Regions:
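FNR/FR-type flavoprotein reductase catalytic core
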Residues: 56-176
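Ferredoxin-reductase
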Residues: 1-68, 125-127, 153-155
């Protein structure tokens, strides 16, 4: 997870984005890549990005230290049409680092829960160690206003949730 604070406090305070939009992060000397802004729009003190190390730019991001400078162009791209979802039940399905954009919209919907119907999440990963945002998932499992189902691909000692591939667990849940 990378947290970015803009140099200009006024720009940071006035920055707006919608759930699902991305930011183009530039690491000087390494290049640039787009990443989902996964802090909720209500967060005004920093922008958060989840970066899985997979290439030169992401490796450079993983080598950053607090206070290092990066370039940011944001917000970019489309966003979730959450205003169209008001009053409706919503079911999210995601896996691995694909949780990054889902997390953003989930945080927004949970902040405005009264505007939406039932919110459900099916999230899976290869193993418990591969679960993104595990600290929040534990909180979400305890929320009475959220139906959260977690799964991993294969049995793992101590795992108390579903075991199986996401499509198979989805069939088992049989959402309407």
């Amino acid at each position: 997870t990378l947290r970015v604070v803009l140099d200009d406090p006024e720009a940071m305070e006035s920055f707006t984005h919608a759930p699902g939009q991305v930011g183009q992060l530039s690491v000087f000397g390494a290049g640039e890549s787009p990443f989902v802004i996964n802090s909720p729009p209500s967060r005004k003190d920093y922008l958060q990005f989840s970066v899985m190390q997979a290439g030169e730019v992401t490796a450079a991001i993983h080598r950053l230290s607090p206070g290092d400078k990066v370039g940011v162009r944001a917000p970019l791209g489309n966003f979730f049409p959450y205003n169209d979802w008001k009053g409706k039940d919503i079911f999210f399905v995601g896996g691995g680092i694909g949780m990054a954009p889902i997390r953003t919209i989930m945080l927004h919907l949970l902040e405005h829960k009264a505007d939406y119907g039932k919110i459900s999440l099916l999230y899976g990963a290869r193993s418990p160690r591969d679960m993104a945002f595990s600290y929040e998932l534990e909180d979400w499992l305890r929320r009475p206003d959220l139906d959260c189902t977690l799964c991993i691909d294969a049995p793992f000692e101590g795992w108390e949730h579903k075991v199986g591939l996401i499509p198979n667990v989805l069939l088992e849940l049989n959402p309407d």
